[in-house]
């Protein structure tokens, strides 16, 4: 019976490390053109996922800041 490798949750830091690895492979000069294009495509897709993640987190932070501002307005003045 074969076991599936347990998928770990997606992490921004791991994705950036993956992109850095792909860039190093591309810059090594050891890949043929088809492999370079494949690695480039993988890096571009991973960076798009990272950008989407960062945008989502930015929006979450804005909501939190807005909520904090509203809570501050609701505090009684002393």
Curated annotation (Swiss-Prot):
HAMAP family: Exonuc_7_S (MF_00337). One of its GO terms (molecular function) is exodeoxyribonuclease VII activity. This is Exodeoxyribonuclease 7 small subunit. It is found in: Cytoplasm. It catalyses: Exonucleolytic cleavage in either 5'- to 3'- or 3'- to 5'-direction to yield nucleoside 5'-phosphates. Keywords: Cytoplasm, Exonuclease, Hydrolase, Nuclease. Bidirectionally degrades single-stranded DNA into large acid-insoluble oligonucleotides, which are then degraded further into small acid-soluble oligonucleotides.
